[in-house]
Amino acid sequence: MKNILNLLFFCIPFVILSQQILPESERARVVDEILEDRFNNLLPNLMDKTGIDMWILISREYNEDPVLKTMLPATWLNARRRTIFVFYRDKKKNTIEKLAVARYNVGKSIVSAWDKEKEPNQWKRLIELIEERNPNTIGLNFSKDHNIADGLDKTDYDEFMANLPKKHKSKVMSAEQLAVGWIETRTEREMLIYNQLVTITHDIIAEAFSEKVITPGVTTTTEVEWWMRQKVTDLGLETWFHPTIDVQRTNDELVSHLYSFSGRPDNLTIIPGDLLHCDFGITYLRLNTD
């Protein structure tokens, strides 16, 4: 009877955590709903704030711009061939066009604007869209200061500039502030989900630091790290980065934070009185904790 009670005690946290996590099909629905809200309500404000009339994102399959990847619908795990998004903001009319220079729509929000039978050349079709709208500014994802906003590769940049008519070249500018704004800004719904994500993260840490996982004098820091990573996998989530556990003891000298990544010993046995520090983060519904 005692063994059964112990088993139930250990299973309860897992059941509670599992109940908080949506199945894949429901996750996809939520991701796409959030994305549509961001396109329709957040993006126009960001484009107005940063002064960019037209934002063009260009990526090729398996070498995606990290910003463009956050704009893909849940069923798109990668870009397809060369994927080009064009967002055009007409502030006077208070409209925003969300176009794809692709043969198919990208989810529900981004509409195909390329009929390959009429115009076989993808670059020429992109230039037609620019000419038709004649924006004052054209934002591209290149940046010296923000890695996340530097997703346009040199090949696509060179081809774009080679095809762009001379009269539009002076309009090209870095979209770094727009790209960063898109990544850093969270909607009300995302913040509700984020609170749940933080709770799940804290619950995993609490369980990892409990007697269920750690036996003082026996369990090592490496074992706890791998337990945390396995726990995330078992819950159907993803680890944002590999967990690290380091031990702080009374007589130890303070060391640089770099010690946690390269200098700390592996398989350090945890003993009574140790203060445990962890660096841990998970990914859920395209949000991350750290």
Which positions does each model-derived feature cover?
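Short, contiguous acidic and Ser/Thr-rich linear segments
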Residues: 215-219
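Short, structured beta-strand/loop micro-motifs enriched in basic residues and often containing a Trp
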Residues: 250-262
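Short acidic/His/Gly/Ser-rich catalytic and metal-binding motifs that mark active-site loops
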Residues: 21, 183, 252, 285-290
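Short, acidic (Asp/Glu-rich) active-site segment that either coordinates a divalent metal cofactor
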Residues: 167-173, 238-244, 263-290
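A glycine-rich phosphate-binding loop feature that marks nucleotide/adenosyl-phosphate handling sites
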Residues: 223-225, 245-251
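Bacterial Sec-dependent N-terminal signal peptides
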Residues: 1-19
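Short acidic-glycine loop/turn motifs at beta-strand connectors
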Residues: 87-93, 248-250, 271, 284
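A composition/biophysics-driven feature that prefers long, compositionally simple stretches
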Residues: 19-210, 221-233, 267
